[in-house]
Regions:
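Transmembrane helix recognition focused on a "late"/terminal membrane span
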Residues: 1-12, 30, 34-128
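Alpha-helical membrane-anchoring segments
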Residues: 2-42, 130-137, 199-200, 234-236, ...
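A residue-level detector for conformationally permissive "hinge/kink" positions
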Residues: 7, 12-14, 19, 24, ...
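Generic detector of short alpha-helix boundary/capping microenvironments
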Residues: 8-10, 15, 20, 82, ...
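Short, charged/polar micro-motifs that form catalytic or ligand-binding hotspots
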Residues: 11, 19, 23-24, 31, ...
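Helical transmembrane-bundle signal
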Residues: 19, 35, 39-42, 46, ...
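A structural signal for multi-pass alpha-helical bundles of membrane permease subunits
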Residues: 53-55, 130-431
């Protein structure tokens, strides 16, 4: 029965006990019946389709039609998301009932406003149309991105490996065991993680810095108006960007080949000793950085050239009148204005290079090998080590735990760089 002066507390409690009851109490019968129908559908699903997956998620034991631990885990994750969505819906239903009751009470002296709230504020089809349009995209993103991501994270808390592999075997929950194994001080795993993480950070910093420096140098040279055919030179320097990165990496793999590579052939013809590009730790890392600089420089050149052209000539003319040297103009005008534009791109590039799987995997395969390691080579970064653990050593749970740590490292790394570069404060200022 609709109340002419509903109380928000009563409306909220009614909706908490039964979805839609608070709306009916407020006089919104259609809305209340719809909410109640949604709750009824969920309760039916909870007793039928969701019961076994939720139970299996807790125990990972065969239940109902689920006999494979992987299927049990996947079904349990999907069921958990369904429950989470319903919980969100139920909370929204309570808030809506209480807020609507407050609106009716505040406008009690104006019957036409109360009537509008009860009869016109909720037009189901008009409200639902935008969500219907984006529903396919949301479903695709849910099953292609969210579910695999959640499945990979959850695996980190199991013992899923070659020796606990369905369908012949089953895996169980082990809590934080995999993380403790990787982070335990003094352990072989922790030493391996420290080595790989150290090189990973060095590679991200050096790769980003060298590519930016080379792009900046070339952009400054091409900015000189005394150089003829600047457009042609710029087009030539941009060609590596047009070539697929995989092709460029394979070309460098051939160039650095120790036995018959052109680089070593040239060194031998000059009477120098051949360089063990892929057999020595230091030279292997140098080859990775050189390849990275070749692939990344054109992008940096393009971005920096565009940023330089956006700086007004009047600024340089005023600096010249004030007696500033070219070096002072660069240090106090060009570079600060340039960094205000490219700093966000540098931070994103740094995060991307932290997970740059392709160059390492295709050029060195993570090698050369390191004695006594857990499969990680001298040029392995965290992502290639994750791949090696998961697809070569078949230690899927350990690989998942390492992937979670990689995610945490990248988030922290990016936040620190955003803070140091002032990008966050710049965005807040623009807002």
């Amino acid at each position: 029965m609709a109340r002419s002066n509903p109380k928000p507390q009563v409306a909220g409690v009614l909706s908490a006990l039964l979805a839609g009851a608070g709306q009916i109490y407020n006089g919104q019968r259609k809305k209340g019946i719809t909410y109640a129908a949604v709750e009824a559908v969920f309760l039916v699903l909870l007793q039928t389709a969701l019961r076994d997956p939720l139970y299996g998620l807790v125990t990972l034991d065969p239940v109902g039609r689920f006999v494979d631990s992987r299927h049990i885990l996947l079904a349990g994750i999907i069921a958990s998301f369904v429950v989470a969505i319903y919980v969100w819906f139920h909370i929204a239903n309570i808030v809506d009932a209480a807020s609507t009751a407050s609106s009716i009470r505040s406008r009690h002296a104006l019957p036409e406003d109360v009537r509008r709230i009860r009869t016109e504020d909720w037009a189901p089809m008009r409200t639902a149309v935008p969500y219907i349009y984006i529903a396919p995209s949301i479903l695709v993103a849910f099953f292609v991105i969210v579910i695999p991501l959640a499945f990979g994270i959850v695996l980190a808390f199991t013992n899923y490996s070659l020796y606990h592999c369905p369908p012949a075997g089953r895996f169980d929950w082990v809590g934080l065991t995999n993380f403790k194994k990787l982070l335990k001080p003094g352990s072989l795993w922790q030493g391996q993680l420290t080595m790989v993480l150290g090189w990973n950070i060095a590679y991200a910093l050096l790769g980003t810095g060298l590519a930016f420096a080379s792009g900046l140098g070339l952009a400054l040279i091409l900015q000189n108006r005394h150089i003829r055919f600047r457009g042609a030179f710029r087009a030539i320097l941009m060609l590596p960007w047009a070539v697929p990165a995989t092709v460029s990496i394979m070309v460098f793999f051939g160039l650095f080949n120790t036995t018959f590579g052109p680089v070593n052939e040239i060194l031998r013809s000059m009477g120098l000793r051949a360089v063990p590009w892929f057999q020595h730790r230091t030279w292997a890392r140098v080859s990775v950085l050189l390849t990275h600089v070749w692939i990344s420089t054109p992008f940096n050149l393009s971005v920096i050239s565009a940023a330089l052209q956006s700086i007004p000539d009047e600024v340089y003319e005023a600096a010249t009148v004030d007696g500033a040297s070219p070096r002072q103009s660069f240090a106090r005008i060009t570079f600060p204005l340039l960094m205000s534009v490219v700093a966000p791109i540098l931070v994103l590039s740094l995060a991307g290079n932290f997970n740059n799987f392709g160059i390492i995997y295709l050029l060195t395969g993570g090698g050369p090998a390191v004695a006594g390691s857990r499969g990680a080579g001298a040029t392995d970064i965290l992502m290639t080590w994750v791949y090696d653990l998961g697809f070569r050593q078949l230690q899927w749970s350990t690989a998942s735990a390492l992937a979670v740590l990689v995610f945490i490292f990248v988030v922290i790394f990016s936040l620190i760089n955003f803070k140091l570069s002032g990008v966050l404060s710049q965005l807040k200022t623009e807002e």
